[in-house]
A protein has these predicted regions:
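Subset of outer-membrane beta-barrel
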Residues: 18-341
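Bacterial Sec-dependent N-terminal signal peptides
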Residues: 1-23
Length: 341
């Protein structure tokens, strides 16, 4: 435990020195597909998102695709919860262990909004029509242990956003590595998320009819035209994470995680999390996300979890719950269920 504390303190001190200096420009609001930045699962969110260095977790498909290389059997995980401003966030993951050939995973993420009134300048109370938004990410992941300490993984994703009759779409990749160091099991994870093409909205909502010369009569009064929208990049993340155990006994484990993140649309920041594990049955978690982020609203996060081996089968049922504080925007409660066959 002493050596784990030394390593963790050293890592935090280096990162704090780097991130304590605010960047002159955060580039906030310059990327699209913001739903890709939402923490997927309850376990990871309960630890403040500090899981890039964790191993054998199915939700690592989102955080670091290399971390699923140690997954055993067939795993299924899904969740559905209310996001901010009455939106709904849903996800599903499937992981399949191929033995020495590695692990493959499939994932789907969806963020949707309820119907709302279509309003215009001339009809601010509504035209009688309704619109909604829908974001989708569907991906395929492959991860493999290259040695007994080092794993490599990657994901290929299709990303789409819809607003009423307009759509933007592109493709992206995630790449990650995970290395278990010889220093008392401390693990180092590195990942790049959402490296891909730019997106812009296109569809019949951009089609208009205009009169190019309103001062003259008798000319062509209506010309079909299209609003030309701009391309915007995806929210790119570079993560470096450390994880390990302060305490590791037969009945009790206290694990930690600390992630340093460099996004392309905000200032650099740290995530820190802890997980107390009692006999692999009961889990208590806490986290501090977005440390040193400029103008952050995120507060502490908390979580609990439970493993249950279904009678007369080898199926493991896992239930995870987390509570995340978003300051003036309220709290987000996550609940997800996992099965491992």
């Amino acid at each position: 435990m002493k050596y784990a504390l030394i390593i963790l303190t050293y890592a935090i001190s280096i990162c704090s020195a780097q991130f304590g200096n605010n960047q002159s420009m955060s580039k906030t609001g310059t990327t699209v597909a913001q739903f890709l930045k939402i923490g997927m699962d309850a376990r990871s969110s309960g630890m403040g998102g500090a899981v890039a260095g964790q191993k054998a977790i199915l939700s690592g498909i989102y955080w670091n695709p290399a971390s699923i290389a140690g997954h055993k059997g067939i795993g299924v995980q899904f969740g559905s919860y209310d996001w901010l401003v009455a939106m709904k966030y849903q996800f599903a993951i499937v992981g399949i262990d191929l033995g020495e050939k590695g692990v493959i995973g499939l994932s789907v993420i969806n963020l949707s909004s309820p119907d709302d009134l279509v309003r215009t300048v001339s009809e601010p109370h509504g035209t009688g029509e309704k619109f909604s938004t829908n974001d989708l990410s569907a991906g395929f992941t492959y991860s493999k242990m290259l040695t007994d300490r080092f794993s490599l993984g990657g994901s290929f994703k299709y990303i789409q956003q819809n607003i009423w009759h307009s759509t933007a779409r592109t493709f992206a990749v995630d790449i990650g590595t995970l290395f278990e160091t010889p220093f008392y099991g401390t693990r180092l994870g590195v990942s790049i998320s959402n490296y891909g093409g730019k997106m812009r909205m296109e569809g019949r909502d951009q089609k208009i009819s205009v009169d190019p010369d309103q001062d003259n009569q008798g000319n062509v009064e209506f010309v079909n035209a299209v609003y030309e929208t701009e391309y915007f990049p995806l929210p790119l993340f570079f993560r470096v994470g450390l994880s390990g155990e302060f305490i590791k006994t037969e009945s009790l484990t206290l694990a930690y995680g600390v992630d340093a993140l460099h996004p392309n649309d905000n200032t650099e920041y740290l995530n820190f999390g802890l997980e107390l594990d009692y006999r692999k049955l009961i889990f208590i978690r806490g986290g501090l996300p977005s440390l040193y982020k400029q103008d952050k609203i995120e507060g502490p996060s908390f979580g609990i979890g439970m493993n249950y081996l279904i009678n007369r089968t080898s199926t493991l049922l896992t239930i995870d719950y987390s509570l995340s504080d978003y300051g003036p925007l309220g709290e987000i409660k996550r609940l997800n269920i996992s099965f491992n066959f």
